[in-house]
Structure formats: C-alpha cells, structure tokens
C-alpha cells in the first residue's frame, strides 16, 4: 500500500471543514492519486483502540451529526449538486459560457414541454449569478440553464472523459 496523501493539503482541507458536515476529496489530475481525503465531522479513533465504553459508543451513534458515516464514500447526496462543477467546467471548455456570464435565478426554472417548474433550493432565488457565485451557493437554476444551453449529448460525452459511467477499480467499503 502506497499512501499518496499530501499532509499539508490534508491539514488545510481539514481546517476548512472541521466544524462542518461534509467531505473533501482532492485528486491529482495527472495520475489519479488521492492527495486529500476528509470526512467531517470526525471522531477520536483512539476510542476504538481498546474496548470502547458503552457511554462513548452511544454518544457516537446518537450524535445527530453522524460522525461514524464516511461521507466521502457512504454519504448520499443528490447527484445534481455533485455534477454542478462538471457541468460548469464542460460549459466553459465548450465556450457555452465564460466565468462572468450572468444567469438570473428567480427561484424556479421552466423547461419547454414540461408542466412543473424545477425549483432552486433558495425559494426567492439568487438573482443574477455567475459561475463562481453559483458554485458557492449551489444555485440550481444557474446549472439547469447552463445544462440546457450545453446540451445533454455534450455533457454526457464530456462526463465520460472525466470517468463518469466507468468502473473506478477502487477497493471501497460497500
């Protein structure tokens, strides 16, 4: 086993997420090495070096922040949010948008020939939003519109280039 974690990056990533719930995974784009891998909140692994007390175990399993879940591997998230950075990148690479392109988020987005509007998590909308703001705010409407402008075939072809729809060959738990 060869560890590829960059300790400085790992420490930096930890500082960014230590009081939050989520995960950070950073890969080297040249060779696929995992250089940072964080799941938060964490817990003291030393609790398990000997027999963990019932009290400590109950604290962990009853913690509403769920520290025993490895969010990077076992977390369950809507795929839309995990695809947003890729949709944005593909639209940039295909010159569909540039980093300053503004798209208005009114809180909902309607597709032609579709009865129900798709809603943004922020009911009142984000207003005019560029790519950077839309990523940091996870603005659904911005990415609905960018995906529509880019087209499903272009998105699908490019996602495949990034490894979507392919086996990872990673030995992950479950």
Language-model regions: role of each:
Residues 5, 30-81, 86-174:
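Beta-lactam-recognizing serine transpeptidase/beta-lactamase-like catalytic domain environment
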Residues 1-23, 30:
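Conserved, well-ordered alpha-helix/loop/beta-strand core segments that scaffold catalytic motifs
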């Amino acid at each position: 086993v060869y560890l590829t974690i960059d300790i400085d990056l790992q420490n930096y990533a930890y500082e960014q997420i230590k009081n939050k719930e989520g995960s950070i995974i950073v890969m080297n784009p040249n060779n696929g090495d995992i250089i940072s891998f964080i799941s938060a909140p964490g817990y003291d692994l030393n609790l398990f070096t000997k027999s963990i007390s019932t009290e400590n175990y109950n604290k962990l399993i009853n913690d509403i922040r769920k520290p025993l879940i490895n969010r990077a591997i076992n977390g369950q998230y809507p795929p839309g949010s995990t695809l947003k950075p890729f949709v944005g990148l593909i639209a940039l690479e295909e010159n569909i948008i540039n980093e300053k392109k503004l798209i208005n988020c009114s809180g909902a987005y309607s597709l032609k020939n579709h009865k129900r509007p798709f809603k943004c998590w922020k009911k009142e909308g984000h207003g005019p939003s560029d790519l950077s703001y839309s990523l940091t705010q996870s603005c659904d409407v911005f990415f609905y519109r960018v995906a529509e402008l880019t087209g499903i075939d272009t998105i699908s072809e490019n996602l495949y280039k990034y490894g979507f729809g392919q086996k990872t060959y990673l030995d992950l738990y479950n």
